[in-house]
Amino acid sequence: MSLFSCLLLWTLWAACSHGAMDECIDEDDRPQRCMPEFVNAAFNATVVATNTCGSPPEEFCVQTGVTGVTKSCHICNAADPRLHHGAVYLTDYNQPVQPTWWQSQTMLAGIQYPNSINLTLHLGKSFDITYVRLKFHTSRPESFAIYKRSSEDGPWTPYQYYSGSCEKTYSKNNRGFIRTGEDEQQALCTDEFSDISPLYGGNVAFSTLEGRPSAYNFDNSPVLQDWVTATDIRVTLNRLNTFGDEVFNDPKVLKSYYYAISDFAVGGRCKCNGHASECVKNEYSKLVCNCKHNTEGADCNVCKPFYNDRPWRRATAENPNECLPCNCNGKSAECYFDPELYRATGHGGHCRNCADNTDGPKCERCLANYYREASGQRCLSCGCNPVGSLSTQCDNTGRCSCKPGVMGDKCDRCQPGYHSLSEAGCRPCSCNPAGSTQECDVQTGRCQCKENVDGFNCDRCKLGYFNLDPQNPQGCTPCFCFQHSTVCESADGYSVHKITSTFDRDDEGWKGKQRDDSSVPVQWSPSSGEISLISEDYFPIYFVAPDKFLHNQLLSYGQNLTLNFRIQRHDARLSAEDVVLEGSGLRVAVPLIAQGNSYPGEETQTFVFRLHDTTDYPWRPTIKHADFQKLLYNLTSIMIRGTYSAQSAGYLDNVSLVTARRGPGTPARWVEKCTCPQGYLGQHCEQCDQGFRRSRPELRRFSTCERCNCNGHSDTCDPETGMCNCQHNTAGLSCERCKDGFYGDSTVGSSSDCKACPCPAGATCAVVPKTNEVVCTNCPTGTTGKRCELCDDGFFGDPLGEKGPVRACRACSCNNNIDPNAVGNCNRESGECLKCIYNTAGVFCDRCKQGFYGDARAANVADKCKPCKCSPYGTVDRQTACSQVTGQCPCLPHVINRDCGACELGFYNLQSGKGCERCNCNPIGSTNGQCDIVSGQCECQPGVTGQHCERCEVNFFGFSSSGCKPCDCDPEGSESAQCKEDGRCHCRPGFVGSRCDMCEENYFYNRSTPGCQQCPNCYSLVRDKVNQQRQKLLDLQNLIDSLDNTETTVSDKAFEDRLKEAEKTIMDLLEEAQASKEVDKGLLDRLNNINKTLNNQWNRLQNIKNTVDNTGAQADRARNRVRDAENLINTAREELDKAKEAISKVDIKIPTTSGDPNNMTLLAEEARKLSEKHKADADQIEKIAKDANDTSTKAYNMLKKALDGENKTSSDIDELNRKYLEAKDLAKNLEKQAAKVHAEAEEAGNKALKIYANLTSLPPINTKTLEDDANKIKKEASDLDKLIDKTEKEYNDLREDLRGKETEVRKLLDKGKTEQQTADQLLARADAAKALAEEAAKKGKSTFQEAQDILNNLRDFDKRVNDNKTAAEDAMRRIPQINATINEANDKTRRAEAALGNAAADAKDAKAKAEEAEKIANDVQKGSAKTKADAEKAFEDTMKLDKDVDKMMDQLTAAEKELEKKKAEADTDMMMASMASDNAKDAEGNARKAKSAVREVLNTINALLGQLGNIDKVDLSKLNQIDNALKDAKDKMAGSELDRKLKELNDIAKSQEDMISDYDRQIQEIRADIANLNDIKNTLPEGCFNTPSLERP
């Protein structure tokens, strides 16, 4: 196996071991394994050799290997620098051109087995050795060994043996191997490098891990980790290799055998066990690791003093195994590793010298009689009281162990309930637990009583209190007695009772309520047996208790209200009013977490609230106990908050209220029995005694009792209300007034104090103080007056019958057509309505006023009387009144509708004021008999005119129900455009036909002379003969007719005579005809030919004329369409100008309040309307464009049909086809522009609506956004204006093209298009080639990168390993080859990228890629510069660089310079692209010149066609002239160099094809080069299969 392959294997191993790591922490500041860089540890290191030539000087000869050849001999002199070969040359810089070497004495001096030579290399520090390499200047030894020491004072361990006689020399098997499980630190022996050849430059490389089974599990193999560790390397040279000629003892032969080594290299890393990324020299110039991971030592082989929490370990790829700090709780900075502690706890750091009175492996505990303070920082002295404590040691909180009855942290005082501290402790107090706090005076023993308790031992209630209860924090309950007594006691016969709601069957009457008292439904769950409330917002919702929990709950004072409650979400926001009680005009509330309750959560919890006024139960506001009891006595509401956040729910269950009731059971001792003062009765003094009443009945039982007072009209009164049982027509609480219907002073005290009132129906009355007049005060409804003798306002009648019979007062009936708040709506006597409203009138407002109509009695005001609103033009005498029922106005003749505002069908002129006039439309000439309501113009059939559609239009005829037909008289053949009634035109002389569009016999049409011209005289003879024959035929016909019509009988003889006569006549005619035929036969033949020719030419010219006429008509229509489109565009532009002007005038002001945004609404509405109008305009433009497209299509089809088969005018068809396509394209563009205008109009409308929507949401208004929107709309309007200008220009271009009607031949341009298509195809191929080239470039760059990596490895190898000369030369030979291949591939890739396509855009792309390549080259150059700088530094540190490496660097620099040419070549390609663009422009100019030439030829052809159309007689010479002119035109066309220009274009296209082919070829070459690079890559070995062996010396 080659040395190079072995080194690659080691490179792979180093990469797998992350050997190139530079940092000991990763990007997340986490520790990771790190190692120093891979170096040649032997470089410039001192080697001690046990034998060296030159002392004294001696001669040695160079071994040639050929017997009998004169040997080349030299002198080795240690004193001469030029001739010495000391051990210093073993580790210097190896230069193949000027080699240096160490050399031993020759065999002549006794250097041969068993004598051996040792070469000892001291590394100065332990290294992880990867390989040891020796490069021999002579032939390699027959036997030598490599040893190593793991420490500077350790034993030598054999590394590897090399021998041609392994068993004989080293007692080792030749090429042995190590099996799994065997000792992997044994040295092996091999004969692989023991041949005598080569005689010069042989390499021997030993890989320390090769052949070791655990090499691929190196991180977990301590054996191999120790195996590769070395501080010293020794090479022992045991036996020289010879040819056997030494047996002759020839001095010259013996002088040719010696040891010589030119390079001694040791590859490895400074050993830092994965905890350092570099080794540095310390203050003693000794090489040590710059340790990280809290490690130290020369090899980072121990943890720092305070980092011993786990045992030191070597870092691995999976675990950096950094040393961890000891946990001394901040009490020590010293620790050591305790293996036992580590095995027991997993933490081995044992702290030393703990501070702050602490102790333990982690300083985690305090010293005896010390405790740790609350902050945990230090330990404090316990300080226990010796009298009161049981021990001097306290607990972790500093509390001492106290004697009975003693308390305090230091046991220095008595506990509550104890007193008199002594050696025996404290004595207990004798306090009543129900009335005391269980504490007493520590000196006297007097008990501390609860708030409402008294006595030395707190065993009795204070005055005004009762029921000494241990559960009562105040001890005793205050007497209530409705505040009428302060003396009470516990009542007998009452037991404990609970009012509950368990919600087992329903919600039991519980309700939900918000703060605004609005009701919220309560949800009851039968499955969970609970009720719930759900909120949508943060406003709270309360559960409201039903009646059974309310009213008199006085017996619940001091007792508990209990409930189970949970919430849906945990984010509850509590308040001060979570539980609310209301009653007797009082209101108290408490938070849910008051009185020691927990915070509500998603789990059900029990909440307990004591109904008491003490401050321990913080009901707010704070009220006295009497008020709290008063509240409970008349409890009107219990509310429990159910929701505490938005979108949440609260769940309530098991509500109970403790109270008391009479009956057996657990005694309720909190029920009072009062001792009442005089005037009071009842258990709670809640009643007044006989003869007493409430002084303030509204206070009910809280009112004091006083004696009854009835002003002498009663002896008794109601004890609760104080109401007297009044007599003598008196009334009132104390009989202090007369009852209704009576008057007088009841306080006098006599039985006649009150008298009856003089009023009807028992009405009440009063006495006027000044006049003592009795006045009725409560008259019956509808009456008024002192004695109720008058009808009230709004009523009528005669209640006293003063004006006739008695009539009771009744309400006036006005059909709800009066103002009920008005006064005097009707007459009080008759009931007539006086103030009718809603346009009504009448006694009872039961009809509409004049000029109004409708139902005055309608219940709905809108259905009552409405104004007539008669039309003044259509109403009789311009009346304003109408039918009050139907609203119909009186209409003039032939006027209709309710308001007389329209004419009948077939009538008009409503504004005349005299009625409508009949249209009188002609039933034949009009469409429907109707006319314009203002002008009276009838709707006419096509071609019909006149106000009544009674006649045909000018130049029309055939008046009928379908309209009039156009005369369509030929303008040249008719005297006028108007025809006769039968449609026949008035013809000019020589013209015939209904349209005067044909010449009569013996007349012909000549385009050069107006009108039909008479044929030559020769045609007159023919015409005369024809007329004679026609006359004879006519005579014959007349004869036959006369025979049929005659009444006379013709005899057979006469008939035969006449028949013979006729036959004779016919034969004469036949003979004359035959004679004429013979005479004029030649003339007829010639005439027939001429006529045939003329007919063909005439038909052809007529077809052309029709085509031109149709084309002109189509062009006119298209021009009209274009004109219409221009008008629409102008209109759109005007509208846009208006829109821009309106937008520019927009001044959006911020309203000072949130007022009405009507102005902005109007603006948005106007913008929306404008956008809709633009949309309509765009639709119209689109329609016109479509019509123009259809027109162009129709024109194209007509022209194509007319010119089909005409070879000479095929160019015309092509040009018209082109025109059609251009018109179609323009129409499509117009449609697109219209669609764009349409879309922009819609977008403007949408934005306007959006502005409107935004404005309607004011306030606030973001003026900045509005200004931006306005500016944006302005910009869009400006863009739209530009778009319209562009569209107008396109329309102008189209119009000019249509006006020109030039039939230009574009064959050249068509061929140019074909060439363009070919070029497009070529460009497509170029694009495909570009894609392939880019992919190839990508692969080439990837291969380049891989080769560059290999090059870097080789460079690093050459710099640091300094292999033997043969391998180095081989590597150097391969490096230029690889670089040359890479450079060539990159150069071709660059050329392919730069040359793909001949367009400027492709050249720009190529230039960009060239710049990128230049950047890559610059990067490579920078890397090379750095390498060069490193080399220069190495040169300064040592002696000089190897010239071969310089040569390699020169080759790399040349490659970089070659890459720099890339940009220049890309610029050249840019210039070539520009030239190609210029060529394309020249081709376009040539095409234009060809177009001009074709146009000129076309004009000539048109002139010839014109001459053909002006033939006045057949002239063969003229036809020959035309033929010659046509040939001249063809020659002229041929002289226009069209063929040459076409050939030039073809040549350009062929050149482009050649360029593309060249690019394809280059791409194929690039692919081949890439394949070659891949082959080179694949030939690099991936492993080393040497099996070296070592043995101990």
Curated annotation (Swiss-Prot):
Any Pfam family: Laminin_N
Stretches for region Domain II and I: 1014-1593
Subcellular location: Secreted, Extracellular space, Extracellular matrix, Basement membrane
Record-annotated Laminin N-terminal domain positions: 30-269
Region forming the signal peptide: 1-19
Origin: domain of life: Eukaryota
Keywords: Basement membrane, Cell adhesion, Coiled coil, Disulfide bond, Extracellular matrix, Glycoprotein, Laminin EGF-like domain, Repeat, Secreted, Signal
Gene Ontology cellular-component annotations: basement membrane; extracellular region
Ranges in a coiled coil: 1021-1580
Keyword Disulfide bond: yes
Ranges for domain Laminin IV type A: 505-673
Disulfide bonds: C270-C279, C272-C289, C291-C300, C303-C323, C326-C335, C328-C351, C354-C363, C366-C379, C382-C394, C384-C400, C402-C411, C414-C426, C429-C440, C431-C447, C449-C458, C461-C476, C708-C717, C710-C724, C726-C735, C738-C754, C757-C765, C759-C776, C779-C788, C791-C809, C812-C826, C814-C833, C836-C845, C848-C865, C868-C882, C870-C889, C891-C900, C903-C916, C919-C931, C921-C938, C940-C949, C952-C964, C967-C979, C969-C985, C987-C996, C999-C1012
Ranges for domain Laminin EGF-like: 270-325, 326-381, 382-428, 429-478, 708-756, 757-811, 812-867, 868-918, 919-966, 967-1014
Glycosylation sites: N44, N118, N560, N634, N654, N1006, N1091, N1159, N1189, N1207, N1254, N1364, N1379
GO BP annotations listed: animal organ morphogenesis; axon guidance; brain development; brain morphogenesis; cell adhesion; detection of light stimulus involved in visual perception; eye development; muscle organ development
Stored InterPro entries: EGF-like_dom, Laminin/Netrin_ECM, Laminin_IV, Laminin_N, LE_dom, LMN_ATRN_NET-like_EGF
Quaternary structure and partners: Laminin is a complex glycoprotein, consisting of three different polypeptide chains (alpha, beta, gamma), which are bound to each other by disulfide bonds into a cross-shaped molecule comprising one long and three short arms with globules at each end.
Function field: Binding to cells via a high affinity receptor, laminin is thought to mediate the attachment, migration and organization of cells into tissues during embryonic development by interacting with other extracellular matrix components.
Record's protein name: Laminin subunit gamma-1
